[in-house]
Amino acid sequence: DLVRLALQTDSTRVVTLTLSTFSVVPHVPGVKNETHGLTHHGNEPDKIAELRRIEEAQLQVFGELLAALGETRETGGSLLDRTQVLYGSCLGNANSHSNQNLPILLAGGGFRHGGHLAFDRTNNTPLANLFGSMLQDLGVEADRFATGTGTLRGLRS
């Protein structure tokens, strides 16, 4: 609720919300181990099951945030319509510490939703291209961001 209220009242335009319980055992039913140890699961089914429970709980919180933003009516739409919400991880496979093929979700902000964009797994598109697209959507005149090579196609509604 605090994030929604801060955005709704224009108290801030940027929020970072960390849902990680990285070095502690999270308060998630069925989880007995701390998150970091579980990410090095070695393909052990019990560890993967606990990690899945943690990720499901995190996505539940993310979904609740999106719902709250979507239910907050503003002139011309909802708070979600004018808010970019990015959810992701710095690792594509924490078990091997791979930073390739990151799982990233983008919601709101006038982007085209309800689909899935996939990119060449061997010739990765830089994540910075997504950030470049997000900047352009905010009205920043930038051809690219940081180590990006441009922007992402297929995001615009």
Question: Which residues make up each language-model segment?
Answer:
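Ligand-binding pockets and gating/stacking loops
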Residues: 1-157
